[in-house]
From Swiss-Prot:
Pfam families: PBP
Region (Important for secretion): 210-242
Family: Belongs to the phosphatidylethanolamine-binding protein family.
Biased composition (Gly residues): 38-50
Annotated CDD domains: PEBP_euk
Gene that encodes it: Pebp4
Record-given protein name: Phosphatidylethanolamine-binding protein 4
Length: 242
């Protein structure tokens, strides 16, 4: 009887040790960002990350993620990611300036059109203001698309993501089109309002079909406030100098 008790105690000890090792390895994997998320920054334009993670988009929303990178300060490349609540990122992105947008396989001698829109205005369940135009730039050289320096003819100034309260996650979509020799502009009516923009009609007008590349990220309104938010513009200036 005593031997059976000893054997049972030994088995329980081994089981507990195995469980502890398993939990330790799981914790280590999470700390390294595997699986289920990616640390902000990642050694690319951006920065600290401070220990929070960028969750990947749901499977149903990854079809647009095609070889286009979108870098915001602190977070790094957020292509195909969800902006996390940690580090006030959902607040900060509403005040940061335009991101670095890189298309590594752009053609050096070509001109490109960059489009950034929100198809979920005012909400994904009721997108009556689809598409909300956040950024529109034509005549971007292939070299600038490769470097991420978006210069050209600005048809709509960059407007940061500002999803309304209680509307859930919004998709912010980026499309890059090969412009060719097209002279692209907005009509008087289009210039008058950012919301309810007929993107399909605009593309048809200039014979633009499938984008050469595209991506999207998601974010939503965050009600938390912090004094740290006041330092965003200073951080942005440092980011622009990188």
């Amino acid at each position: 009887m005593t031997m059976k008790l000893v054997a049972a105690a030994l088995c329980l000890s081994l089981l507990a040790a195995g469980l502890w090792v398993g939990l330790s390895l799981t914790a280590e994997s999470i700390e390294e960002g595997k699986p289920g998320g990616e640390k902000p920054g990642g050694g690319k334009p951006g920065g600290s990350g401070r220990g929070c993670f960028l969750p990947p988009l749901p499977k149903e929303d990854v079809s647009l993620c095609r070889n286009l990178e979108v870098f915001y300060m602190e977070m790094g490349n957020i292509s195909c990611k969800i902006v996390p609540k940690c580090n006030l990122y959902r607040q900060k992105i509403t005040a940061w300036q335009a991101p670095i947008v890189k298309f590594h396989t752009a053609l050096d001698g070509a001109l490109y059109l960059l489009v950034m829109v929100d198809p979920d205005a005012p909400s994904r369940s009721n997108p009556v203001m689809k598409y909300w135009r956040h950024w529109l730039v034509s005549n971007i050289t292939g070299a600038d698309m490769k470097s991420g320096s978006i210069r050209g003819n600005v048809l709509s100034d960059y407007s940061p993501p500002t999803p309304p309260p209680e509307t859930g996650l919004h998709r912010y979509q980026f499309f890059v089109y090969l412009q060719g020799d097209r002279d692209i502009s907005l009509s008087v009516e289009e210039k008058a309002d950012l919301g309810g923009w007929n993107l399909d009609k605009f593309l048809q007008q200039y014979g633009l079909r499938d984008p050469d590349t595209s991506t999207q990220f998601m974010t939503q309104f965050d009600e938390e406030l912090s004094s740290e938010f006041g330092r965003i513009n200073d951080d942005q200036e440092q980011f622009n100098q990188k």
